[in-house]
């Protein structure tokens, strides 16, 4: 975006949500994050969620909660990861008509991962199975592939 471009408040929120979302993923994908990288990643995820809550509707809010859950899980903060994962599922459940078929499997995956980070293998496996079953219902092949890739990645603390 050019520096001199004028945006409405809504457009600015959308712009920053997208920007911070991308910056969060850049750091999530970075193999050798420093403690400062981890803090910036967390800050970016919170900023992205804040902007999505203003400009993105239920779908983006749900996905922002999912992303924040993933960041907390990567940082080993299971209780916070679980809180945001459960919010992701609650938003999905309250807005099913607005969601895509990949949103439910991702919400289950976030809960499973949060339980894994928290050391609760039983609940992690339960939600992992739910995520896998829900993932089978994803109709768009690219979305299904993305979900399965995310499901396979990351640290599952021995659950998988």
Language-model segment annotations:
Residues 6, 25-26, 46-53, 86-96, ...:
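Amphipathic alpha-helical segments of tetratricopeptide repeats
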């Amino acid at each position: 975006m050019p520096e001199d471009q004028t945006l409405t408040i809504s457009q600015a929120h959308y712009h920053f949500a997208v920007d911070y979302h991308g910056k969060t993923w850049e750091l999530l994908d970075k193999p050798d994050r420093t403690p400062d990288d981890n803090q910036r990643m967390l800050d970016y995820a919170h900023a992205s969620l804040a902007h999505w809550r203003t400009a993105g509707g239920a779908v983006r809010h749900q996905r922002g909660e999912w992303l924040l859950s993933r960041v907390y899980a990567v940082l080993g903060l299971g209780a916070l990861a679980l809180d945001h994962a459960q919010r992701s599922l609650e938003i999905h459940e309250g807005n099913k008509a607005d969601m895509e078929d990949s949103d439910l499997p991702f919400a289950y995956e976030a809960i499973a991962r949060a339980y894994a980070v928290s050391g609760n293998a039983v609940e992690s496996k339960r939600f992992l199975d739910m995520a896998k079953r829900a993932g089978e219902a994803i109709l768009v092949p690219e979305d299904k592939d993305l979900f399965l890739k995310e499901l396979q990645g990351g640290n599952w603390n021995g659950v998988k």
